[in-house]
Swiss-Prot record:
A Gene Ontology cellular-component term: endoplasmic reticulum membrane
InterPro entries recorded: Vma21
Gene behind this protein: VMA21
Location within or outside the cell: Endoplasmic reticulum membrane; Endoplasmic reticulum-Golgi intermediate compartment membrane; Cytoplasmic vesicle, COPII-coated vesicle membrane
Species: Gallus gallus
Main location as per UniProt: endoplasmic reticulum
Name of the protein in its database record: Vacuolar ATPase assembly integral membrane protein VMA21
Amino acid sequence: MERYDKATLNAAFAPEFRQNEGSLTSTLRTLLFFTALMITLPVGLYFSSKAYIFEGTLGMSNRDSYFYAAIVAVVTVHVVLAMFVYVAWSEGTRQWREGKQD
């Protein structure tokens, strides 16, 4: 059985690990970005649309503005989810194509 020193093993596995590390970093960055969007955007749009659009501009009652602001928040959640799926799908096919060409 051959003995491999640490430098030889590191040199053999380093390029593959670094490629996976970049892919993992990119995936984590995408996930954190869309997580932040998923938390802040619907909540922010809920309160801002309730106060400024529905009650302020359109003059709706408090009860009606709650209802329509909730619809805005739900639509926003669906838009963010659709954007995440699109970006994740595009990133996955790009990585698959790059791996296929190697």
